[in-house]
Amino acid sequence: MPRLIKKVGSLRRGKRGVPKGVIHIQASFNNTIVTVTDVRGQAVSWSSAGACGSRGTKKSTPFAAQTAAENAIRMLIDQGGMEQAEIIMKGPGPGRDTASRAIRKSGVVLSFVRDITPMPHNGCRPPKKRRV
């Protein structure tokens, strides 16, 4: 007799506790985006400086990045929390250090912090300098 395979329901919109995960911080000169994923790369929660209410040039401030990181961690705690995490930072923006500082203060144990900012090995020509 064939064995019945249990159907696993979708976890979308449901609460799921993630014991270990990855916190991605993408800091550009215009905005800071914080995404929390599990170890497989499935997004659990996210936030950005623009989604937290900052508009225009205020999105690129360190305070807006701190607010985005706190908001992403708060959403994560509401879903069940996370004990251990890794931080992966990308981009040269002004909010990268402030966002990682806010994550450290939240109580999540960090295993390591990695910087994956893309650096050209003399690749494409950069845009011309602004003359204001």
From Swiss-Prot:
Domain of life assignment: Eukaryota
Gene3D superfamilies per record: Ribosomal protein S11
Biological process, per Gene Ontology: translation
Location(s) in or outside the cell: Plastid, Chloroplast
GO molecular function: rRNA binding; structural constituent of ribosome
Keyword Nucleotide-binding: no
Chief subcellular location: plastid
Assigned GO CC terms: chloroplast; ribonucleoprotein complex; ribosome
Keywords from the named record: Chloroplast, Plastid, Ribonucleoprotein, Ribosomal protein, RNA-binding, rRNA-binding
Pfam families (UniProt xref): Ribosomal_S11 (PF00411)
Transmembrane segments: none
Protein family according to the UniProt entry: Belongs to the universal ribosomal protein uS11 family.
Assembly mode: Part of the 30S ribosomal subunit.
UniProt xrefs under PANTHER family: 40S RIBOSOMAL PROTEIN S14/30S RIBOSOMAL PROTEIN S11
Protein name: Small ribosomal subunit protein uS11c
Gene coding for it: rps11
